[in-house]
């Protein structure tokens, strides 16, 4: 019998790339003419980004700049969860953007069910915030990866630790 092959499914965001994207967005905001005299800012906190601006229109522009820089740095926009827009001091508006790290229990159940329903001969096991997929054939594992890439999930997935 062939030795089992396996890989892990994770959802991770490179914190350093996020920091770089935030710094680039701040630089662009400082140089853009439409932000002259504006008190708009982007702050990075642990696991989140805080966007502050004069009004909702400028906040939308700040969001667009940040998203463009994130995509340029290779960070998927599915890794961002936008909070609601709230009032801040002095006619300002604030929005919190959470960075999604790890696979939640609900998403792990969805992914496991999707794999089981596909009838591909592999086993899945949830290990904390990641999922281990193992099977006898490497082709089956590649079929699972293709299946998950096509699936419409609301999180960004990475496939790591491919062992055969």
Curated annotation (Swiss-Prot):
Gene3D superfamilies: 3.30.70.860, YajQ-like, domain 2. Keywords: Nucleotide-binding. InterPro entries: DUF520, UPF0234-like_C, UPF0234_N, YajQ-like_sf. Nucleotide-binding protein. GO terms for molecular function: nucleotide binding. Belongs to the YajQ family. This is Nucleotide-binding protein Helmi_22490. Transmembrane segments: none annotated. GO terms for cellular component: cytosol. It holds the Pfam family DUF520. The keyword Nucleotide-binding applies. It comes from the Bacteria. NCBIfam families: PRK05412.1 (NF003819). The keyword Calcium does not apply. CDD domains: YajQ_like.
């Amino acid at each position: 019998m062939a030795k089992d092959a396996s890989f892990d499914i994770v959802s991770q965001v490179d914190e350093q790339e996020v920091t770089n994207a935030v710094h680039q967005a701040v630089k662009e905001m400082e140089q853009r003419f439409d932000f002259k005299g504006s008190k708009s800012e982007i702050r990075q906190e642990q696991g989140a980004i805080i966007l502050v601006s004069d009004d909702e229109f400028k906040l939308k522009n700040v969001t667009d700049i940040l998203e463009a820089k994130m995509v340029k740095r290779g960070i998927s926009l599915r890794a961002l969860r936008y909070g609601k827009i709230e009032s801040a001091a002095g006619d300002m508006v604030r929005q919190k953007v959470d960075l999604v790290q790890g696979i939640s229990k609900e998403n792990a159940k969805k992914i496991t069910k999707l794999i089981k329903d596909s009838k591909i001969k592999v086993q899945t096991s949830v290990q904390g915030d990641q999922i281990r997929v193992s099977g006898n054939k490497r082709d089956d594992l590649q079929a699972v990866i293709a299946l998950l890439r096509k699936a419409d999930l609301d999180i960004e997935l990475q496939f790591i630790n491919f062992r055969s």
